[in-house]
Amino acid sequence: RGLGDVYKRQPVKKEKRVVFMGNSITEGWVRTHPDFFKTNGYIGRGISGQTSYQFLLRFREDVINLSPALVVINAGTNDVAENTGAYNEDYTFGNIVSMAELAKANKIKVILTSVLPAAEFPWRREIKDAPQKIQSLNARIEAYAKANKIPFVNYYQPMVVGENKALNPQYTKDGVHPTGEGYDIMEALIKQAIEKAL
């Protein structure tokens, strides 16, 4: 994580640092569109394959210790895919709430985002009810955000397609991870929300 050292220094007064907390969708974003992060001074903290449990474990190091003005949290895809064990919506939702509360306790603003659509996971095809689980988790994240006056960015709506609630093939090659075109959609939404929040 050589690049991470650049951010170990504390932000200068006028700099409003923004950290993106996530999984391979965030990691791939930084790789696919590095300029979106560089130009805006955004810091990507996406680690491929991780679930919300693992996010919570590194939240202090990867978010709080960087003293950002704001954190964008995108969690849930790998939980539903059962990457670290059986999926429990209450636990995943609880981890997202814990991250939001940790941020707030450290005077870091929060933007919560929806889980992206996925009809299935190429590495876990036996999970047949991913769309229902994703919709249910998204509804809870959105309701929590609303109740706590936290901005919520809905990536799901503009990217979902068809009765099987898939990630639109225009925006993905594998049904889970966005392509450059998919990230374009996300960038327009998140940039607006960040500017409004700061």
List each model region and its residues.
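A short beta-strand-loop structural module common to alpha/beta enzyme folds
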Residues: 41-54
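Conserved beta-strand scaffold positions in the cores of enzyme catalytic domains, especially
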Residues: 20, 42-44, 152
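Catalytic nucleophile-elbow at a beta strand-turn-alpha helix junction centered on a G-D-S/GDSL motif
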Residues: 15-31, 48-50
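Short, small-residue-biased leader/transition segments that mark boundaries at the very start
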Residues: 2-7
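Alpha-helix N-cap/helix-start and coil->helix boundary motif
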Residues: 26-27, 49-52, 60, 74-77
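The serine-hydrolase catalytic nucleophile loop
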Residues: 31-32, 55
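Short, flexible hinge/linker loops that cap or flank conserved catalytic cores
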Residues: 11-13, 36
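Alpha-helical cap/lid subdomain in secreted, periplasmic
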Residues: 35-40, 57-198
